[in-house]
Amino acid sequence: IEMGDVWGNNSVLSSIGPGGVFAEAYACVPGEPLMVNVTAAEDTRALLLNIRRVLEPCANVCPRHVRLVRNLLTLCSEKNLQLSRRVLHTGPKSIRKRLLSYFSECIKRTGSYSFDIPYNRQQLADYLSVERSALSNELSLMQRDGLIRYEKNHFDVMEQIDS
């Protein structure tokens, strides 16, 4: 999911895997202009839901309907947390601190200092709101300094880093 401005600059907001949900906030706020673009990286099928029918339960209040609403609320909450984390990662002024913030989240999420990320270099640069060449340069410097090792989207972060 990307957000683009009128000058053609894109910023990656998130990525979605199989079974993921997108644009639910727009569906729940009628008339809100769509500010994001969704691009599939592979063949994809999408299920479109009539949000009005989802949010107005039937007279029987069937368990499946309640479960659907609960699942959508959970997904919205998870997405809110994901966007909040992105704000935290793009807050630091230096690219290194943005990377360390993102890596810290990855370590906490996976429970390991060795992890894969769901982005290529351009997508990671967009996610962190930095230029790709500057990001690649900083990753090289961090590897040279012995802070990280990486190959493509796999990273090994050293356990002791003085930020």
Locations of the language-model features?
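Cytochrome P450 core scaffold surrounding the K-helix E-X-X-R motif
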Residues: I1-G8
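Cyclic-nucleotide recognition modules
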Residues: V12-R70
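Short hydrophobic/aromatic patches on the structural cores and recognition surfaces of FHA
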Residues: G19, V38, N80, L99, ...
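Long cytosolic regulatory regions associated with cyclic-nucleotide signaling
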Residues: A25-Y26, N71-K79, K93-I95, E138, ...
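Inter-domain helical "communication" segments and dimerization helices
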Residues: C58, C62-V69, T74-L88
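Short, Lys/Arg-enriched, Trp-marked, Pro/Gly-tolerant hinge/linker segments that flank
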Residues: L83-I95, T110-D116
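Phosphate-/nucleic-acid-contacting segments
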Residues: R98, Y102-S163
